[in-house]
């Protein structure tokens, strides 16, 4: 007799920081029947494999204070909860896993109303408002940073770090024309790019290139000046699919401080100069970056304080300090949790079993 597979709904949407950890967990649950909940016209439309049926609902972030827009958003939430409840029933979902963000609220509420267990993963050190508010209706909140438990005094939490995709765990070939022993600087602004960081780097790049460095600059697709700087050893790309191979080869990264990117830096033991996105909700990227800076794994600078002159000097100093870079790489590696995806998948499996037992 063939056993019916467990049916899992993954609610993850918007940015790589929400999607990549969810995809990593899905890779660990090959025996589950997985379906995906997202938002129309977002990154999940291209990243989520066709093996996972993608369902979309319209949902917006909450507004503080009372206004017509906040009333509209609240009514939209009620509508989206109704849609998700219908989906949970029709698809006979057994358990829900979400990585937070706007999509988490209707997913958690609908699952709660249907008596379906929910596992919520929060990758940032400072949990988002949605996570903090809706965590009370989840079976467990899995944490990307160990210190984040302080924000959940009345909720069961477990530290698992943040999962990375499987390719980060094995050596990956790189198809870029780089000299074998050349110093490689990788500039990455996250899945949405970072125009301000791009401008800073272009003002400094020539000095670094003159010292023999190569630069791979991932600009994102929203930078109108992306092609304004040219040099044989400078590669400007909107995105690069093989991030695992790129960071494994990198000697230094200049990056935002999103939780997903930091996890990839830790797994690949890549020293970094971190420039938190200044408009991130509640400045959460600064909290993330501070963990790495305090551990000696990265330098942390606010965007408003980082001048081209300072960035140029810091990188040149590191170019001339291989011992310092090695020390930073080792400290970065100590922050890595290679089996994070398995830990989260095991959490999903355990709560699936608990739910089955409670129903008998």
Swiss-Prot record:
GO terms for cellular component: plasma membrane. Keywords: Cell cycle, Cell division, Cell inner membrane, Cell membrane, Cell shape, Cell wall biogenesis/degradation, Glycosyltransferase, Membrane, Peptidoglycan synthesis, Transferase. It holds the Pfam family Glyco_tran_28_C. Its main location: membrane. Its EC number is 2.4.1.227. Pathway: Cell wall biogenesis; peptidoglycan biosynthesis. It comes from the Bacteria. InterPro entries: GlcNAc_MurG, Glyco_trans_28_C, GlycoTrans_28_N. One of its GO terms (biological process) is cell wall organization. Coiled coil: none annotated. Gene3D superfamilies: Glycogen Phosphorylase B. The keyword Transport does not apply. UDP-N-acetyl-alpha-D-glucosamine binds at residues 15-17, 124, 165, 191, 285. It catalyses: di-trans,octa-cis-undecaprenyl diphospho-N-acetyl-alpha-D-muramoyl-L-alanyl-D-glutamyl-meso-2,6-diaminopimeloyl-D-alanyl-D-alanine + UDP-N-acetyl-alpha-D-glucosamine = di-trans,octa-cis-undecaprenyl diphospho-[N-acetyl-alpha-D-glucosaminyl-(1->4)]-N-acetyl-alpha-D-muramoyl-L-alanyl-D-glutamyl-meso-2,6-diaminopimeloyl-D-alanyl-D-alanine + UDP + H(+). SUPFAM superfamilies: UDP-Glycosyltransferase/glycogen phosphorylase. It is found in: Cell inner membrane. GO terms for molecular function: UDP-N-acetyl-D-glucosamine:N-acetylmuramoyl-L-alanyl-D-glutamyl-meso-2,6-diaminopimelyl-D-alanyl-D-alanine-diphosphoundecaprenol 4-beta-N-acetylglucosaminlytransferase activity; undecaprenyldiphospho-muramoylpentapeptide beta-N-acetylglucosaminyltransferase activity. It is a peripheral membrane protein. Cell wall formation. Catalyzes the transfer of a GlcNAc subunit on undecaprenyl-pyrophosphoryl-MurNAc-pentapeptide (lipid intermediate I) to form undecaprenyl-pyrophosphoryl-MurNAc-(pentapeptide)GlcNAc (lipid intermediate II). HAMAP family: MurG. Belongs to the glycosyltransferase 28 family. MurG subfamily. This is UDP-N-acetylglucosamine--N-acetylmuramyl-(pentapeptide) pyrophosphoryl-undecaprenol N-acetylglucosamine transferase. It comes from Gloeothece citriformis (strain PCC 7424).
